[in-house]
């Protein structure tokens, strides 16, 4: 977004080890001419939505998603797209298994609900849920949604993988995920996100085995063309950014 408006910048992730809550420092540099490629990406940011109302019956460009995943991957984090139907089915089954376990955990459900609320004065943490209907994992992660009648892919699952599981790896995963979501948004493709199964040892192991990887899956993604839904609620900039002009 900064590049699109002609502002060059540098990004330093975890600039101060003594301040773990300071995830990144952005330093603005002198203005420069706008980049047409970044204007396209800025448009994609506006179009990007988390899938909240299901997927449309429209075939996905599988090769494009594979190429995009390769483009956004780095030496620190890899965007993996799962094209094997059997493996994908196993991942989806693990998601449903984890959902059943978590749904029976009252403490988890209470904590999860506390992170999705409209009262921003009470807490700045979490997701500004407002009155938007939250997506159900059973709706967005059910196995029968994989294929169209023609055999073409209606949805495709993926994951962001890292070699380690430390704060720097989480940040690098977020960067790769953001780049992937912005890239495919330009083609009208959305994504549902899921991480809860990765917090349970049994389903975490099942997902690693299904993806046939020794790397650590940080977040699961399911790509597809989204049904129409309200824009994803966003937190105000002042909630997540420190600046001399912002008060907290």
Predicted regions mapped to residue ranges:
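Acidic, surface-exposed loops and disordered segments
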Residues: 1-248
């Amino acid at each position: 977004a900064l590049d699109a408006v002609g502002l060059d910048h540098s990004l330093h992730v975890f600039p101060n080890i003594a301040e773990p809550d300071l995830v990144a420092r952005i330093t603005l540099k002198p203005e420069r001419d706008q980049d047409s490629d970044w204007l396209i990406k800025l448009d994609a940011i506006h179009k990007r939505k988390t899938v909240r109302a299901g997927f449309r019956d429209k075939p996905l460009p599988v090769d494009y998603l594979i190429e995009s995943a390769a483009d956004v991957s780095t030496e620190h984090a890899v965007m993996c797209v799962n094209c094997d139907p059997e493996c994908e089915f196993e991942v989806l089954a693990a998601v449903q298994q984890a959902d059943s376990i978590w749904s029976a955990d009252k403490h988890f459900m209470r904590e999860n609900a506390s992170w999705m609320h409209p009262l921003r004065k009470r807490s700045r943490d979490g997701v500004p849920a407002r009155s938007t209907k939250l997506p159900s994992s059973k709706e967005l992660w059910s196995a029968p949604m994989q294929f169209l009648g023609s055999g073409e892919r209606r949805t495709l699952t993926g994951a962001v993988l890292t070699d380690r599981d430390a704060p720097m790896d989480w940040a690098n995963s977020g960067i790769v995920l953001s780049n992937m979501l912005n890239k495919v948004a330009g083609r009208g493709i959305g994504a549902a996100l899921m991480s809860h199964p990765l917090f349970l040892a049994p389903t975490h192991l099942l997902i690693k085995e299904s993806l046939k990887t020794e790397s650590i899956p940080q977040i699961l993604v399911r790509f597809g063309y989204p049904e129409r839904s309200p824009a994803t609620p966003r937190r105000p900039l002042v909630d997540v950014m420190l600046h001399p002009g912002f008060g907290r």
